[in-house]
Amino acid sequence: MFPHRFFSVLLFFLLFLAPARSADVEYVWRGVDYQWGSLSNWSVGGIAASSAPGAAASAYEHWMVTNGTDSAGRTDVGGLGAGGRYLKGVRIEGLNSQPEGKIPLFIKNTNKDVYLRVEEGGITVENAGEGGYSADFGVAQLRVAADQEWHVAEGRSLYVGHDDDAPSGGLYSLTSEGDVPRRVTVTGGGAVRIGEGM
């Protein structure tokens, strides 16, 4: 009986001393003018964001989430400064349909030192609900920062790197953070397209 009580107290003591991990933060991107750097395009908990998500100081605590109604467009991470964005994960949950089969949301890049880094939260591409939303997603320069899952729902697409529909004049690559081998598990009935030369 004594050893059991001793280890119970020890476990409680260690849990008490363990540093508290800050909660993940969901940044909702509205995409009205398609610029990451415009804080008017971001909200946190329904209020305006004070900074764009995924800075190095808050590495892998932020999620990029769409709001399902106003996120169609194209944005450039290249103006964010060297190092890029550190995201826990990305959830594309329904976007305005775009004519002529264009990718509703494409994160392009014009700066070779800037990457979109995605950690264990991975990438999810799916419709927010029934109806006229088309939740396709493309990303130019992606660094996989942990083992993760990419879930692409039936009828949806995830484009990584250069593709016929990708914007011209951008940089395209798919790499692993620190060149460490990573495992990416792909689920769902949708399509994942990796560009040429990846």
PLM feature spans:
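N-terminal leader/targeting segments and the first structural element of proteins
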Residues: 169, 196-197
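Short helix-onset patch at the extreme N-terminus, typifying the N->h transition
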Residues: 6-9, 31
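N-terminal secretory signal peptides that target proteins for export/translocation
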Residues: 1-4
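Bacterial N-terminal signal peptides
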Residues: 8-18
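Solvent-exposed adhesion/ligand-recognition segments of exported proteins
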Residues: 18-156, 161-180, 187
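Extended, compositionally simple hydrophobic/Ser/Thr-rich segments
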Residues: 160, 194-196
